[in-house]
Amino acid sequence: MSINATLFVQAIVFLILVLFTMKFVWPPITKALDERAQKIADGLAAADRAKTELAAADQRVKQELAAASNEIATRLADAERRAQAIIEEAKARANDEGNKIVAAARAEAEQQAIQAREALREQVAALAVKGAEQILRKEVNAGVHADLLNRLKTEL
């Protein structure tokens, strides 16, 4: 064989190798590369979707936190208003109770003063009768002179 025939045979073998490679080797390689490219594209798309979902979730969390903060502030204000109302109500009840106690004490003092005056009248009447007995040197009968003694008590 000459160089030209060898070259021609090598070209044919190379052509057969290229055809064999293109028919049997190249399709699985391109398929694997395409699948890999598709996986990468799907992964990038999923990452973009996850990024937008994360941003949306972050926004929802911020809104819910703001709403919760507002609700907490409202509840605290309501609780404070209720506490003030309870305090004012307790003050009013205590004031009413104090006024009742003072009124009862005044009524009791007035009653005691009336009783003391009555006892004093009784004592003054008894002293007046005793004085009259000694002046008259005779005994005054309380049953007989009850009307006179009652008039004397009322005058005192």
Curated annotation (Swiss-Prot):
Spans traversing the lipid bilayer = 7-27
Alphabetically sorted, this entry's keywords are: ATP synthesis, Cell inner membrane, Cell membrane, CF(0), Hydrogen ion transport, Ion transport, Membrane, Transmembrane, Transmembrane helix, Transport
Keyword check for Chaperone, yes or no.
no
What molecular function does GO assign, one term?
Answer: proton-transporting ATP synthase activity, rotational mechanism
**Pfam families assigned:** ATP-synt_B
Gene3D superfamilies, per the entry: 6.10.250.1580
Q: Give the matching SUPFAM superfamilies.
A: F1F0 ATP synthase subunit B, membrane domain
Q: Which GO terms describe its cellular component?
A: plasma membrane; proton-transporting ATP synthase complex
Where does the record place it?
Cell inner membrane
Note the topology in the membrane: Single-pass membrane protein
User: Ion transport: is it a keyword of this entry?
Assistant: yes
Quaternary structure, from the entry? F-type ATPases have 2 components, F(1) - the catalytic core - and F(0) - the membrane proton channel. F(1) has five subunits: alpha(3), beta(3), gamma(1), delta(1), epsilon(1). F(0) has three main subunits: a(1), b(2) and c(10-14). The alpha and beta chains form an alternating ring which encloses part of the gamma chain. F(1) is attached to F(0) by a central stalk formed by the gamma and epsilon chains, while a peripheral stalk is formed by the delta and b chains.
Instruction: Give the family from UniProt.
Output: Belongs to the ATPase B chain family.
Sum up the protein's function in the record's words: F(1)F(0) ATP synthase produces ATP from ADP in the presence of a proton or sodium gradient. F-type ATPases consist of two structural domains, F(1) containing the extramembraneous catalytic core and F(0) containing the membrane proton channel, linked together by a central stalk and a peripheral stalk. During catalysis, ATP synthesis in the catalytic domain of F(1) is coupled via a rotary mechanism of the central stalk subunits to proton translocation. Component of the F(0) channel, it forms part of the peripheral stalk, linking F(1) to F(0).
Kindly give the PANTHER family that the UniProt entry links to this protein: ATP SYNTHASE SUBUNIT B (PTHR33445:SF1), ATP SYNTHASE SUBUNIT B', CHLOROPLASTIC (PTHR33445)
The protein depicted here goes by the name: ATP synthase subunit b
Q: Which organism is it from?
A: Acidovorax sp. (strain JS42)
Taxonomy-wise, where does this protein's organism fall, top ranks first? Bacteria, Pseudomonadati, Pseudomonadota, Betaproteobacteria, Burkholderiales
